UniProtKB/Swiss-Prot annotation:
InterPro entries: G6P_Isomerase, Phosphoglucose_isomerase_CS, SIS_dom_sf, SIS_PGI_1, SIS_PGI_2. Transmembrane segments: none annotated. This is Glucose-6-phosphate isomerase. It catalyses: alpha-D-glucose 6-phosphate = beta-D-fructose 6-phosphate. CDD domains: SIS_PGI_1, SIS_PGI_2. GO terms for cellular component: cytosol. One of its GO terms (biological process) is gluconeogenesis. The keyword Flavoprotein does not apply. It comes from the Bacteria. Disulfide bonds: none annotated. Keywords: Cytoplasm, Gluconeogenesis, Glycolysis, Isomerase. It is found in: Cytoplasm. It comes from Bacteroides fragilis (strain ATCC 25285 / DSM 2151 / CCUG 4856 / JCM 11019 / LMG 10263 / NCTC 9343 / Onslow / VPI 2553 / EN-2). Pathway: Carbohydrate biosynthesis; gluconeogenesis; Carbohydrate degradation; glycolysis; D-glyceraldehyde 3-phosphate and glycerone phosphate from D-glucose: step 2/4.
Amino acid sequence: MISLNIEKTFGFISKESVSAYEAQVKAAQEALENGTGKGNDFLGWLHLPSSISKEHLADLKATAQVLRDNCEVVIVAGIGGSYLGARAVIEALSNSFTWLQEKKTAPVMIYAGHNIGEDYLYELTEFLKDKKFGVINISKSGTTTETALAFRLLKKQCEDQRGKEMAKKVIVAVTDAKKGAARVTADKEGYKSFIIPDNVGGRFSVLTPVGLLPIAVAGFDIEQLVNGAADMEKACGADVPFAENPAAIYAATRNELYKNGKKIEILVNFCPKLHYVSEWWKQLYGESEGKDNKGIFPAAVDFSTDLHSMGQWIQEGERTIFETVISVDKVNHKLEVPSDEANLDGLNFLAGKRVDEVNKMAELGTQLAHVDGGVPNMRIVIPELSEFSIGQLLYFFEKACGISGYLLGVNPFNQPGVEAYKKNMFALLNKPGYEEESKAIQARL
């Protein structure tokens, strides 16, 4: 079970001030359970782990196997919540050098539709020219510009290279049940498709086919991922006392820190494989809480790498920050520091020690230094990098996010602000229906 330690926040806030949130947290939990809070149309994630059927998982696994059998490369086309959850899990569990391994046990997973970089898309299409590839197109509407543009390119290339019949076999849609361009295309072309539930927003969708299908294609155990999430669903339930509920304590602590002037939360990891977990977390909390002119700004760093870039600012910059450190208790491999007769680097004092022991001491030393420098620290410990533990971590953050948003007084399940850039972009591109906006924006240029 993952654990949360908030002791290194005391001195900046008190244990009593965190405990004082108990009644507010209970009200937030009840609002989530009863569907009486803001954004109550998007609570399908709340009990998703415990409600996923074995039949549904079997269908996902079977489809994943078709892609695995027929593709050496699979492109996940999506943006934001439509790809970050899957990528977070896949990157956390994959060999760091899987690209370079001659014998691969699963298709190479590549991501598209998350940017509009012409060079990126050109280089991707060039790379795919001699590859047996498939596509998982993830979009509820099918009209999100970045993803729709990438899919248009990939669909044509797949059909041209592999033929219409094989393309039909290796293109899978994850989209709305009834409406939208992606649904129409899937039905017209005869693609296998999975449904994005209407009551689950993108950033909470990692345990729907949005995340589960790509994760299964990559060769990971989605049943164990779901089981881990279900375990945490129970541990963070509304019936669990405040003092024993990690999601409740995390939500309360970060809100109390925010109330005391800590406006920026930095998610820290000392494991490079967790980089995309941080990226997923940034979207989860940024879109959920950044509204109504308030909200904690979610930032992330990879230590010890970023200690050599951001470490100075964190140690001695403006004291508006707090850190939440994700620590992995047990690594998957063993590597000892060798002895060297010349000892020119002066590292023989580490000879015989595990590399992970050095990393753990860097973690502890950094935490103490940052606390001494005025940065409150929370610490989340996950037992290992496994499907079960990652499933626990994802649900922990989701549940805490729902509670935290209600404590903040915002709707954690909408994102009205993301439409502003789209409106301007469509006006600048002269999209039909945006004529008036186009005139107005041209006058500003």
